[in-house]
């Protein structure tokens, strides 16, 4: 708990010259500051508890409440006089109780002789005084009175304010401590001078001994307190020596500060209403010293009250309660103001009687500070006037004239609505004008009026807050109060019965009368309190209860009858706080003075001896074993079934009154109230527990009861509800539970727009994931169309799509090119932001932010790795350490892969111009600064990807710096060899002008994968044939030798198969045979095989082989092409040498672009083969580029007996195998560029330019690169490579390449001669290509057609030039027809015919001699080229698919039937209009537009009704109707035969009279094989329709 430790010490030393009582060990003598020397009392510390500080010493532990209530006198008993009091002997227990006493308005100053110290005493320093020293007042010494101090209650969650002025002390008998919250404690009073004799009975019965203090008695007030508690009575309290002495020496004749009741409205928790200052009347036999508190005010909830002080005069014991006249002393003014924000200095009250003038006029106490603190400057005059003589006090003794004194000390509990402290009234007459904001004294002298009534005190809630703000002033006031405190001794008087009754009531309600001075700085405590640091276990008061705040002050006019009745009234508030627990008041009424449950030892902590430590023996503690509190489960403990707490749920210990539960749920009471401990039952004990109105005491916010101060707990108490296992426990059901789509009802689907949007968003994400999973280079175009059709219209959806694409891109770096291209297509996508719909955010910005976030994620990854490394190092076992090590390695590997994937993706984005060079340079610099391996690896990946784009003339100095740094890293050898080699590879790549040694290992197309699979299967088949042929050869007994001599096709160059196999049982090792047939398995010097294999796939389908054959035999066993006609070779005789040579020769055509060195290596290897003679001659051909025609002629001469099919296949193989060999030629590093590039250099650079252009589609950069070649005479190589590299790629790639060539021609960088020369080399082989590429003419047309557009080559010139190499082969018209067809699609037949005629072209130029032009034109449908006939549109351009698209566009645009008629008449001739093609296209389009694409699919009959006239016009007979039904059948099959769709169409068509019955029957019985797809399912779906049709006919026939 947050209470300051206060050690218990021995009794204080005796002060010289003062009579001191003897105290038992552990009990500190009370102190009264009456010595001339201003000695501060320092009481040994003791453990603090909750409750009022001044009563702490007399409370037992909160965990030890009395088991039964002690009997006491009813609070309503009238006040009665007691026996004559006596002067306290030295050993009597006395205590100073600060109290606000009202006097007559005598303003005369008084002088107390012997008081030579300052008015104020420092509250924090207290010194022991030797007992027995002579004092100024007879029978009293400073040790007999506890210093008055504000108690610090760490257990109470209230605001505490510093005390600034010690109230006037009044010496009185030591009252028993009020029981803490919920405690039922019987207070025992023992006399230490009589050996600890219990004198409680004597005190409570009215008798007294010579050494026993007599407690005062207070009357109860019928007025309710602001917090709903009943008025409190004064209690007998032992002096608290910890607090500072109160100051004497007030200002005679000066009233206290004005303080009107309504001057302050406080928002905090209420305090009891202050009572008017009591007026002491003569008649007291003992001397009562009243101290005037000048200057600063107390800060424990007190409001300054002004009373006139009387100089204490020594009286003899036994005299009645009167004030002896003292002519030299003025009637003292008691000004006591206590607030709870700081410790309250404990004032001591003298036992000498007070002389109060009858002419006293009550003064209003006015608080000038917000918290009720009197400014220090106002206090100085009081100190100075304390020495003035006072008028003689009144001597008559009249207990009835005593005015009630409001309690002065009010602990923090009361500030939050706790019961007001008991007040001792010195007169039954109260002063109403002082009622509002005064707080009466917290203690009285024990010899005060026999029946002083109680007046409630009040400290409004706002005062508490304002008091907290004035801590500095209050502390200053404390210091001043030490200077002026003077002591007035008091004598004890007998205690009437009513006083004992009121005492018990006060004890039960736990109201402090004297609050000890706190020891720690109040500001610190207030700060802790503000944030809830102070013992939360006792914070049960809701500090902000509106009902309590607005409570008006009550109890200002208590009459004797009302004060004595002590009948609680119903409070207006709905919640009560801490010490206002009703059960305490209830039990306090039944406390008997002579009863006490627990017996305490003399040196043990007990209500009367709070100085001792809380030490208990075994027997004492075992007495609490089975009490109710011991059976309660503390807060915060784990659920243990053995705890008896659950019994409270099943058998409540008390009968619950619903009226007492206004803020909480009715149920078992788990309150660990200490007042309930040991109580047999609470259900039938008088009025309900609680204060007025029976309200249940609650903790903070009414959430639960307050807890003991013995241990901290949370502010709110958890109520554990009982669980009855027999009940049917219902589980919580989510309002929006997830359901599978198949089980979702219509209501679920219509659950609001937000759910609909969320569902649409998730559906969008699912579709994007599906598209990304399918994304391949081959599927890119069609998948991108799907992506562009997606509804990405919100920021959330856009971010989600970006995250999906990004995660996919970095997780699959091999596909980063495709993902980057997808991002490029979506770059312009913009959506409005969520916060500001008027502001848009685009795809590119969000994507770059995502890339940057991932790029800069390394710091977070490092932190995670360090944490995992630390966990691994701290692992206890080797097994755990191994597991953590695996996790760490896995995390690092994942982070590394993500970093590399992100770098690759960033590079691809840069290549697509989505990132700027500055960003990339920043990335390079950042990676280069970090010398860790991950960063360097990312750097190598990045430079490999984008180095070529960054390394241009302007950026060369910067790139040089990068590479110098990389060279330095390599030389330092501080990194691993793997990283150094990667860096070296990048350096080599730059030296080779960024031309890689190997091709880009991108993903393969599905067609390529299928072809490779077919090829592998074909290889295996050839192996089997070779083995079979070899086996048959051996059986013939032929001598082993080179296969060229025997015509076997399986011989390698190395001649391994020439080694004879011994006859016998030696088994054949098939694995070794497989190795023999594999290229490169024999020749150990085959260094060029691997590069060729790595590069072969990079050209896509045109690359073909996937491996570069290194010798002749490998070409025979594993063809380098994907020639699907290569299976024809298997049908030829194995002995046919020419067939073998055909396949071998294909490799030479691929080698023609090699350098001399590469060719020499190949020659050297070929010489080791059996047929090296033939290959040697052919391999020594010059290394110049030869025309394709010459090569074809040479091949034709070498193979005269070769079949035509194989010749074409071989020529195609040679052509397609050329590129891999050319790529091999790029392997050696290229020397720095020369003024004139060689053929090989131009070829290499041309390949790089073409690949880059096809990848980036950057026309401007490609033109610039071609210009930089500076070899205009060799640009035909660029043209040839451009055509070859795109011939088997996509249509878009060919169109792009054609546009690039057109741009080069228009810009003048490429001459027409160079263009034609490059085109010739390809066209010469076109005939051979047609075998492998049936659509080769269309593909060539797609490459050539862009040349004819916009300032290109004239049509006549182009057509005549491109047909030159094709006329001998008779293929000129094939290419021209494809070109004209493409031109008609873009320009229209009319314009194409006009261009043809303008160019002066004639078909006779291109046809073979003797071929009829007219028949050719009619057959090929190119009449538009013959003049007027071209006015009719060419029918070829409106084939079924094109016609369907045009009609679909018209219908989609909402065109009317007449518009469709007009379009058909304008674009189709009569033959096409009458054809089945139009009918099928029209039927398909109309029916498709009538489908409602929902689940399930439905037919929009209205659309068919509108379009019925359109269909009826062209479905003019049964045959046309049948064709229309066929088209409808095909459409339904395309849609995967949706249920009932065809039946709905049939019904609509029949109803609209579009199709007649005969046509339906004809369709049903049709056996046309071309229309049988899906016919069975379609017939089954319309069976009901035909049944109905037949029934309708039967009915019609019956009617007829």
Curated annotation (Swiss-Prot):
Biased composition, class Acidic residues, residue ranges: 463-479
Subunit structure: eIF4F is a multi-subunit complex, the composition of which varies with external and internal environmental conditions. It is composed of at least EIF4A, EIF4E (cap-binding) and EIF4G1/EIF4G3. Interacts with eIF3 complex, mutually exclusive with EIF4A1 or EIF4A2, EIF4E and through its N-terminus with PABPC1. Interacts with EIF4E or with EIF1 (mutually exclusive) through a common binding site. Interacts through its C-terminus with the serine/threonine kinases MKNK1, and with MKNK2. Appears to act as a scaffold protein, holding these enzymes in place to phosphorylate EIF4E. (Microbial infection) Interacts with murine norovirus viral genome-linked protein (via C-terminus); this interaction plays a role in translation of viral proteins.
EIF4A-binding: annotated span: 1450-1600
Domain W2: 1429-1599
Residue list for modification Phosphothreonine: 214, 651, 1213
PANTHER family: EUKARYOTIC TRANSLATION INITIATION FACTOR 4 GAMMA (PTHR23253), EUKARYOTIC TRANSLATION INITIATION FACTOR 4 GAMMA 1 (PTHR23253:SF10)
Renumbered residue ranges of the record's region Necessary but not sufficient for MKNK1-binding: 1585-1600
Protein name per the record: Eukaryotic translation initiation factor 4 gamma 1
Biased composition (Low complexity): 60-79, 438-449, 697-707
Source taxonomy: Eukaryota, Metazoa, Chordata, Craniata, Vertebrata
Gene3D superfamilies: 1.25.40.180
Reported modifications of this chain: Phosphorylated at multiple sites in vivo. Phosphorylation at Ser-1187 by PRKCA induces binding to MKNK1.
Assigned keywords, A-Z: Acetylation, Cytoplasm, Initiation factor, Methylation, Nucleus, Phosphoprotein, Protein biosynthesis, RNA-binding, Translation regulation
Amino acid composition bias (Pro residues), ranges on this chain: 7-24, 269-280
Similarity remark: Belongs to the eukaryotic initiation factor 4G family.
Region ranges (Disordered): 1-88, 173-230, 243-326, 366-501, 507-526, 541-606, 667-719, 734-760, 1029-1117, 1129-1238
Ranges of compositional bias, category Polar residues: 34-48, 208-220, 551-562
GO aspect biological process, one term: regulation of presynapse assembly
N6-acetyllysine found at: 606, 1099
Single GO molecular function: ATP binding
């Amino acid at each position: 708990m947050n209470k300051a430790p206060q050690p218990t010490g021995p009794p204080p030393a005796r002060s010289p010259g003062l009579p001191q009582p003897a105290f038992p060990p552990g009990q500190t003598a009370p102190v009264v500051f009456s010595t001339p020397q201003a000695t501060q009392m320092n009481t040994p510390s003791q453990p603090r508890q909750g409750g009022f500080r001044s009563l702490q010493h007399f409370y037992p532990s909160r965990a030890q409440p009395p088991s039964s209530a002690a009997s006491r006198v009813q609070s309503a008993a009238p006040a009665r006089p007691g026996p004559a009091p006596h002067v306290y002997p030295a050993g009597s227990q006395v205590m100073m109780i600060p109290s606000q006493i009202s006097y007559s308005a005598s303003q005369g100053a008084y002088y107390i002789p012997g008081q030579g110290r300052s008015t104020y005493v420092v509250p924090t320093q207290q010194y022991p005084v030797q007992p027995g020293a002579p004092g100024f007042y007879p029978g009293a010494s400073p040790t007999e009175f506890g210093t008055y101090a504000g108690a610090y209650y760490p257990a109470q969650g209230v605001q505490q304010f510093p005390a600034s002025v010690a109230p006037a002390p009044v010496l009185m008998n030591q009252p028993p401590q009020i029981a803490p919250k919920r405690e039922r404690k019987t207070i025992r009073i023992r006399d230490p001078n009589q050996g600890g004799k219990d004198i409680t009975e004597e005190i409570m019965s009215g008798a007294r001994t010579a050494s026993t203090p007599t407690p005062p008695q207070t009357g109860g007030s019928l007025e309710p307190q602001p917090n709903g508690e009943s008025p409190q009575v004064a209690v007998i309290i032992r002096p608290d020596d910890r607090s500072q002495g109160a100051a004497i020496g007030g200002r005679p004749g000066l009233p206290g500060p004005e303080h009107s009741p309504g001057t302050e409205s406080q928002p905090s928790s209420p305090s009891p209403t202050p009572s008017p200052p009591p007026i002491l009347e003569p008649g007291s036999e003992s001397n009562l010293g009243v101290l005037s508190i000048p200057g600063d005010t107390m800060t424990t909830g007190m409001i300054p009250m002004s009373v006139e002080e009387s100089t204490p005069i020594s009286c003899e014991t036994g005299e009645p309660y009167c004030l002896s006249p003292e002519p030299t002393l003025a009637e003292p003014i008691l000004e006591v103001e206590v607030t709870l924000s700081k410790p309250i200095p404990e004032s001591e009250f003298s036992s000498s009687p007070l002389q109060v003038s009858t002419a006293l006029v009550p003064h209003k106490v006015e608080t000038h500070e917000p918290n009720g603190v009197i400014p220090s400057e106002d206090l100085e005059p009081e100190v100075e006037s304390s020495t003035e003589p006072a008028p003689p006090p009144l001597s008559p003794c009249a207990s009835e004239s005593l005015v009630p004194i409001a309690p002065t000390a009010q602990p923090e509990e009361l500030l939050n609505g706790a019961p007001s402290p008991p007040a001792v009234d010195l007169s039954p007459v109260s002063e109403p004008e002082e009622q509002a904001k005064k707080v009466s004294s917290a203690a009285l002298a024990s010899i005060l009026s026999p029946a002083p009534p109680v007046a409630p005190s009040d400290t409004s809630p706002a005062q508490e807050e304002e008091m907290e703000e004035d801590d500095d002033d209050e502390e200053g006031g404390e210091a001043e109060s030490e200077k002026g405190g003077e002591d007035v001794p008091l004598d004890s008087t007998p205690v009437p019965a009513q006083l004992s009754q009121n005492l018990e009531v006060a004890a039960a309600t736990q109201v402090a009368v004297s609050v000890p001075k706190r020891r720690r700085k109040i500001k610190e405590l207030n700060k802790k309190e503000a944030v809830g640091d102070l013992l939360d276990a006792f914070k049960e008061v809701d500090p902000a209860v509106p009902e309590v705040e607005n409570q008006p002050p009550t109890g200002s006019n208590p009459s004797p009858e009302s004060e004595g009745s002590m009948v609680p009234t119903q409070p207006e508030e709905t919640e009560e706080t801490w010490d206002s627990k009703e059960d305490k008041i209830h039990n306090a009424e039944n406390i008997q003075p002579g009863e006490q449950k627990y017996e305490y030892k003399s040196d043990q902590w007990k209500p009367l001896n709070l100085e001792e430590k809380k030490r208990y023996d075994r027997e004492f503690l075992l007495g609490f074993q089975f009490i109710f509190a011991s059976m309660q489960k503390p807060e915060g403990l784990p659920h243990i079934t053995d705890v008896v707490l659950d019994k409270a749920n099943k058998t409540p210990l008390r009968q619950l009154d619903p009226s007492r539960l206004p803020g909480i749920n009715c149920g078992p009471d788990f309150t660990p109230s200490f007042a309930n401990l040991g109580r047999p039952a609470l259900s039938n004990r008088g009025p309900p527990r609680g204060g007025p109105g029976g309200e249940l005491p609650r903790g903070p916010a009414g959430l639960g009861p307050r807890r003991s101060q013995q241990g901290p707990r949370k502010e709110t108490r958890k109520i554990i509800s009982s669980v009855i296992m027999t009940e049917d426990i219902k589980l919580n059901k989510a309002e929006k539970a997830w359901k599978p789509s198949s089980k979702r009802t219509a209501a679920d689907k219509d659950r609001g727009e937000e759910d609909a949007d969320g569902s649409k968003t998730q559906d969008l994400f699912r579709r994007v994931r599906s598209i990304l999973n399918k994304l391949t280079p081959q599927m890119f175009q069609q998948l991108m169309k799907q992506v562009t059709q997606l509804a990405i219209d919100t920021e959330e959806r856009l971010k989600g799509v970006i995250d999906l694409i990004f995660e996919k891109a970095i997780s699959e770096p091999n596909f980063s090119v495709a993902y980057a291209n997808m991002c490029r297509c979506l770059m312009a996508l913009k959506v409005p932001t969520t916060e500001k719909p008027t502001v848009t955010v685009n795809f590119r910005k969000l994507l770059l932010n995502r890339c940057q976030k991932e790029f800069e994620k390394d710091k977070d990854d490092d932190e995670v790795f360090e944490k995992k490394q630390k966990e691994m190092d701290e692992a206890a076992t080797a097994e755990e350490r191994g597991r953590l090590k695996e996790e760490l390695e896995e995390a690092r590997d994942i982070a590394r892969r993500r970093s590399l994937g992100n770098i690759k993706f960033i590079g691809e984005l840069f290549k697509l111009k989505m990132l700027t060079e500055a960003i990339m340079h920043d990335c390079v610099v950042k990676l280069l600064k970090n010398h860790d391996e991950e960063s360097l690896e990312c750097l190598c990946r990045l430079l490999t990807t984008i180095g070529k784009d960054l390394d241009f003339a302007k950026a060369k100095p910067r790139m040089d710096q990068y590479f110098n740094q990389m060279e330095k890293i390599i030389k330092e050898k501080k990194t691993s060899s793997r990283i150094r080699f990667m860096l070296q590879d990048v350096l080599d790549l730059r030296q080779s002008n960024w031309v890689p040694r190997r091709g880009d290992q991108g993903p393969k197309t599905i067609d390529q994968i299928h072809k490779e699979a077919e090829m592998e299967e074909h290889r295996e088949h050839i192996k089997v044939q070779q083995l079979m042929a070899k086996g048959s050869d051996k059986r013939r007994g032929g001598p082993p030798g080179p296969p060229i001599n025997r015509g076997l096709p399986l011989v390698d160059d190395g001649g391994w198969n020439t080694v004879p196999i011994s006859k016998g049982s030696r088994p054949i090792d098939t694995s070794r045979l497989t190795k023999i047939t594999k290229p490169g398995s024999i020749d150990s010097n085959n260094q060029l095989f691997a590069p060729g294999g790595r590069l072969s796939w990079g050209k896509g389908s045109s690359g073909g082989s996937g491996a570069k054959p290194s010798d002749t035999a490998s070409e025979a066993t594993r063809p380098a092409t994907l020639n699907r006609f290569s299976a024809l070779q298997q049908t030829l005789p194995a002995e046919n040498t020419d067939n073998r040579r055909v396949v071998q020769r294909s490799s030479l055509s691929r080698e023609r672009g090699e350098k001399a060195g590469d060719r020499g290596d190949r020659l050297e290897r070929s010489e080791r083969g059996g047929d090296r003679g033939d290959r040697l001659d052919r391999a020594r051909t010059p290394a110049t580029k030869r025309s394709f025609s010459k090569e074809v002629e040479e091949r034709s001469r070498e193979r005269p007996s070769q079949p035509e099919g194989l010749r074409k296949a071989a020529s195609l193989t040679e052509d397609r195998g050329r590129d891999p060999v050319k790529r091999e030629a790029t392997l050696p590093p290229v020397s720095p560029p020369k003024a004139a590039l060689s053929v090989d250099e131009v070829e290499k650079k041309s390949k790089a330019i073409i690949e880059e252009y096809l990848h980036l589609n950057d026309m401007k950069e490609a033109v610039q690169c071609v210009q930089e070649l500076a070899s205009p005479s060799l640009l035909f190589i660029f043209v040839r490579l451009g055509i070859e590299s795109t011939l088997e790629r996509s249509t878009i790639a060919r169109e792009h390449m054609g546009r690039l060539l057109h741009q080069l021609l228009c810009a003048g960088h490429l001459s027409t001669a160079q263009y034609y020369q490059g085109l010739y080399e390809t066209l010469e082989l076109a005939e051979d290509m047609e075998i492998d590429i049936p659509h080769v003419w269309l593909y060539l047309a797609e490459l050539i057609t862009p040349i004819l557009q916009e300032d290109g080559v004239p049509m006549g010139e182009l057509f005549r030039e491109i047909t030159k190499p094709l006329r001998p082969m008779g293929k000129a018209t094939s290419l021209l027809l494809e070109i004209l067809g493409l031109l008609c699609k873009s320009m229209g037949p009319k314009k194409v015919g006009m261009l043809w005629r303008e160019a002066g072209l004639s078909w006779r130029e291109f046809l073979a001699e003797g071929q009829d032009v007219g028949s050719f034109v009619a057959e090929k449908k190119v009449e538009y080229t013959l003049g007027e006939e071209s006015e009719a549109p060419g029918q070829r351009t409106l084939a079924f698919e094109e016609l369907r698209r045009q009609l679909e566009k018209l219908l989609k645009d909402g065109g009317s039937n007449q518009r469709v008629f007009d379009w058909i008449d304008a674009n189709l001739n009569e033959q096409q209009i009458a054809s089945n093609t139009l009918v099928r296209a029209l039927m398909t389009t109309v029916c498709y537009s009538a489908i409602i694409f929902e689940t399930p699919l439905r037919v929009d009959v209205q659309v068919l009704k509108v379009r019925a006239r359109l269909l009826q016009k062209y479905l003019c007979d049964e045959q046309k109707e049948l064709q229309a039904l066929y088209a409808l059948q095909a459409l339904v099959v395309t849609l995967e035969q949706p249920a009932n769709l065809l039946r709905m169409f049939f019904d609509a068509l029949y109803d609209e009279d579009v199709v007649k019955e005969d046509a339906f029957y004809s369709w049903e019985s049709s056996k046309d094989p071309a229309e049988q797809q899906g016919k069975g399912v379609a017939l089954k779906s319309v069976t009901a329709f035909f049944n109905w049709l037949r029934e309708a006919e039967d009915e019609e026939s019956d009617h007829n």
